[in-house]
Amino acid sequence: MTTKRTFQPKKRHRERVHGFMKRMSTKNGRKVLARRRAKGRKVLSA
């Protein structure tokens, strides 16, 4: 029995779990975005 690849990418799942709207929907999510802005990240969220 071989080990399966654990990363099975799905665009919808990625957006819904790690997307901008998801980040904005919670207080801590907004903190994440603020930190990433402060750090100067080009991409803030998925």
From Swiss-Prot:
Residues 26-46 are annotated as: Disordered. It comes from the Bacteria. One of its GO terms (biological process) is translation. One of its GO terms (cellular component) is ribosome. Keywords: Ribonucleoprotein, Ribosomal protein. Coiled coil: none annotated. It holds the Pfam family Ribosomal_L34. PROSITE patterns: RIBOSOMAL_L34 (PS00784). GO terms for molecular function: structural constituent of ribosome. HAMAP family: Ribosomal_bL34. Belongs to the bacterial ribosomal protein bL34 family. This is Large ribosomal subunit protein bL34.
